[in-house]
Amino acid sequence: MSPDIGPWVARFERPGREIYDRRHEIVAATGVEAGMVVADIGAGTGLFTRLFAARVGASGTVYAVDISPAFVENIRRTSRAEGQHNVQGIVNSPSEVSLPPRSIDIAFVCDTYHHFEYPAAMMRSIRAALKPGASVVVVDFRKIPGFSTPWVMGHVRADESAVVREIEAVGFRLVEDRDFLRRNYFLRFVPVEDSNAH
């Protein structure tokens, strides 16, 4: 692990962070299966990349997509060290995920959507990368006055209903809203033409 990644691992992969504590339930809820192609968008330290890589197996692929070259290089290095040869790293731009067209079964966006500088462009880019019948899972912080922490209230740009409106405005439909997390929501979207597929 490169020295600049260590503090991020300590921050993101720690007991007490809901996403870390419930990571196995979150992965199960995505429906990722052996042989699938998954994009972990905003992959960060690779927590979910590693879990998806184990789940899709040798016949599947996980794209670890992040805007940070240091994060992507760390994921490449740690994946190789752990024998996960089904992981590919992609450094993306603020408005483009840089994935091959019609290549993925599930796009997973965890505690990352609120960082998108150009959410409409990013979601259109993700849509272009989806295979027919594919879906996008968005997990992000609940932003609720009186419930959410001051950090979330100040840091997270949009609440859940605004996120749903933004994503639906670029040609997606919400098809699943799972209520098993306390501090985060779990939403699944499909392109409008595929809205009856799930």
PLM features: what roles do these ranges have?
Residues 135-164:
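Conserved class I S-adenosyl-L-methionine
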Residues 176-198:
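Core SAM-dependent methyltransferase catalytic element
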Residues 37, 61, 133-135:
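Short glycine-centered segments of the SAM/dcSAM-binding site in methyltransferase folds
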Residues 97-106:
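A short acidic, Gly/Pro-enriched loop at the edge of an enzyme's catalytic core
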Residues 1-39, 77:
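Class I SAM-dependent transferase core
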